[in-house]
Amino acid sequence: DASGVFSGDTWSAIHYYLWNPINIHRVVATVAYGGSVVGAYAAFKFLSAQKQEERAHYDWMGYNANFIAIAALLPLPFAGYYLTAEIYAYSQQMGITLMGGVFAWLFIIQAVLIGALFLSANYYLWCGMGRSEGAYRYNPKIKYIAIVLVGAFLVWFTPHTLVPTKSELKGLGGPHHKDLGALGIMPAKNTAVNFLIVFTYLSFLFYRRSNKIATVSWAAAGNAAQIALFAAGLINITILGVYYGYFTNTVYKVAASVPQVLTTLVISILPPTTTIR
């Protein structure tokens, strides 16, 4: 009521404004975490197996577990953005407390964990490519994917403000780092996480196609179309993040995250049908 006293029943306390966003986020996160745990178990059993049949079984188990983990990991940041947007819509003070207040460092810890999941998933894919005879075509590209992933990961968990001591505050000249402070706001993080998703998807495409050769007559045109799709999408994500994130007002800054997500979804959903060379 007006005095702040809750007078509803148990269901009213549970089924509140953030019920659906939290459920969506938790379900997606649980699937991603479960797939990762099963994949880690399969990797351990694969390394310790003595028989070839056991190694083949756990290799198959790891492949399916990693597929499930990546399938849930790719939309997980979007589910988190949806939850955060609903929190701000419900209470701006709650959102400020979450992102810039007492819970801000929990967000940083969560960002580190999510980034570690992305890097681990990619590393699993690259190790799988090492056992594929046809992966030599893609091996030279892996180092560039790794550089982008690590760079995006560093931006992803860079904090905007710290809780410094007086001496640290004096040394920084304020609560924000003069060079890295710009990487701590959401436009940079939105751009970074979209790059994480796109390049993880690219690693998965290379992994799936390591032992496949395109035989259709339009393979060259198909490859060119795929490369153009990825290039145009990444350029669009960068422009939306940099220009609308730093050179326009707050309304456009927040709204730019939506076309970024749509761009990533278009890149991921449009199924490439030939092998990228």
Question: Could you describe each region identified by the protein language model?
Answer:
Residues 1-277:
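Polytopic transmembrane helical bundles with strong interfacial aromatic enrichment
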